[in-house]
């Protein structure tokens, strides 16, 4: 279930320390901010560091309809660079959108897809938790270890044609 208060968090993390595999949900903007949310709920740093092994953040986005997907000429390399694409990536990428067809009920979308990020709570992350690193500091450490953000995954999905620019903005704009 969802961890809504300190008591529930403490029970879940203590169960994890005794060898139980614990899955739970917590509303946060991204994986690194989960750590600071637990700290803000009053959970001791040592408990978070010792009990957490992996944090997954996710968003659901509508998938471009593969039957009516067309190039999105409104999305030019400048727009893609504003999203964080390199100049080279932006010049090679081709954005798509669904124009609408009977198979997608004229919406341009067919199905949903997950956009994820996975934070491995490694030794450097555990050490950062113990020294009460901020969310940006945790993210920076994780990125150095190969962490891919939801924005990174979203950009790959735009480049592959599965996700359109507007849906990326709708789902990830507050990030």
Predicted regions, residues:
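Short, flexible helix-loop junctions that flank or precede catalytic/ligand sites
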Residues: 1-175
């Amino acid at each position: 279930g969802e961890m809504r208060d300190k008591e529930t968090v403490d029970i879940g993390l203590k169960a994890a320390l005794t060898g139980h595999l614990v899955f739970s949900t917590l509303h946060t903007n991204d994986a690194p901010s989960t750590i600071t949310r637990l700290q803000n709920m009053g959970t001791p740093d040592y408990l978070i560091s010792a009990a957490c092994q992996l944090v997954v953040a996710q968003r659901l986005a509508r998938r471009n309809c593969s039957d009516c997907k067309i190039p999105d000429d409104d999305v030019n390399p400048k727009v893609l660079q504003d999203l964080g694409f390199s100049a080279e990536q932006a010049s090679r990428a081709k954005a798509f959108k669904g124009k609408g067809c009977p198979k997608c009920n004229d919406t341009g979308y067919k199905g949903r897809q997950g956009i994820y990020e996975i934070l491995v709570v490694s030794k450097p992350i555990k050490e950062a938790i113990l020294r009460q690193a901020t969310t940006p500091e945790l993210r920076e450490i994780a990125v150095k270890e190969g962490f891919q953000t939801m924005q990174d995954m979203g950009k790959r999905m735009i480049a592959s044609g599965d996700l359109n620019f507007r849906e990326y903005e709708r789902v990830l704009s507050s990030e």
